[in-house]
């Protein structure tokens, strides 16, 4: 006989400070939110990415509200995207430097412009996706909708968007030189800096930093190729290369969003652990107490780290935060 105590009946209430943090959610349902375009990017070129993206998020949230996993079946993918195939698998093979990571390689722009010169941009799908990317970076907002999603939900199409960003910049440089790259970067960096402020997820902010780093390295390469800069170049670059401001590097919104995901999915805890869903596990787990512990040990510490200056972080970054 095995006795398993039902610890779940002694679960805690949600901490008041958590309730307060979650009481003012950001509304992603605003005009000009690029997040919907991200979710619609995988659709066939004939479909409107914005319309598809809204339908995808609505489908995911509707399933979560009914207690189902917020994921898409093959049939749902076919109906929403117009296909179940990955339509963006071929052009990255033609231009492999589109996947070049600026964190690991400082020569991404050089490699990509060489590949574009050897094989000019002509793929119909790629040209359609570049047009979609142009639309994305014209949007005034990028706010991920994390409401009523779970840990199995698909992310926005961050990877393909990064690849398109690099191709977009390389094409501008190859066609119009430094002037073209500066003009392209003005629009690109404006969008990504806005995303750095509004992004509701940590992965979104990491992707944004990657995109900005790629833009900076591209500009650095192009500037280095110029024998001298004109006064107009210098003026535009000074405007473009302003340091990030405190509100642009604040990660509180992303941490709160991570906390919200934990709170909304705490009753499905056993669905996400390797042991699987079982009655003994249901007895042993205190879902809300686990969320409270996660908040005190991780989220609250993240808030404290976010308030440190660069020098303080490097000096104290390995010190436990109480």
Q: Regions from the language model: what does each represent?
A:
Residues 1-322:
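Short acidic linear motifs
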């Amino acid at each position: 006989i095995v006795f398993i105590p039902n610890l779940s009946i002694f679960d805690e209430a949600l901490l008041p400070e958590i309730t307060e943090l979650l009481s003012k959610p950001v509304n992603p349902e605003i005009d000009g939110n690029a997040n919907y375009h991200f979710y619609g990017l995988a659709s066939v070129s004939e479909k409107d990415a914005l319309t598809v993206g809204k339908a995808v998020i609505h489908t995911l949230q509707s399933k979560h509200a009914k207690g189902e996993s917020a994921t898409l079946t093959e049939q749902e993918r076919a109906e929403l995207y117009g296909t179940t195939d990955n339509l963006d698998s071929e052009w990255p093979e033609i231009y492999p430097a589109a996947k070049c990571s600026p964190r690991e390689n400082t020569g991404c722009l050089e490699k990509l412009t060489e590949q574009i010169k050897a094989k000019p941009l002509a793929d119909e799908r790629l040209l359609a996706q570049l047009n979609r990317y142009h639309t994305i970076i014209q949007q005034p907002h990028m706010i991920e909708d994390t409401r009523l999603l779970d840990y199995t939900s698909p992310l926005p199409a961050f990877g393909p968007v990064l690849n398109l960003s690099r191709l977009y910049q390389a094409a501008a440089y190859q066609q119009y030189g430094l002037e073209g790259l500066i003009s392209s970067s003005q629009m690109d960096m404006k969008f990504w800096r806005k995303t750095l402020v509004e992004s509701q997820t940590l992965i979104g902010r990491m992707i944004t930093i990657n995109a900005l780093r790629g833009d900076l390295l591209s500009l650095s390469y192009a500037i280095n190729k110029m024998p001298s800069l004109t006064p107009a170049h210098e003026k535009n670059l000074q405007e473009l290369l302003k340091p990030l401001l405190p509100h642009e590097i604040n990660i509180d919104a992303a941490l709160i969003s991570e906390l919200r995901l934990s709170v909304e999915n705490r009753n499905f805890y056993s669905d996400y652990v390797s042991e699987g869903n079982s009655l003994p596990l249901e007895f042993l787990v205190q879902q809300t107490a686990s969320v409270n512990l996660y908040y005190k040990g991780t989220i609250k510490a993240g808030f404290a780290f976010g308030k440190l200056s660069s020098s303080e972080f490097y000096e104290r970054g390995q010190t436990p935060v109480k």
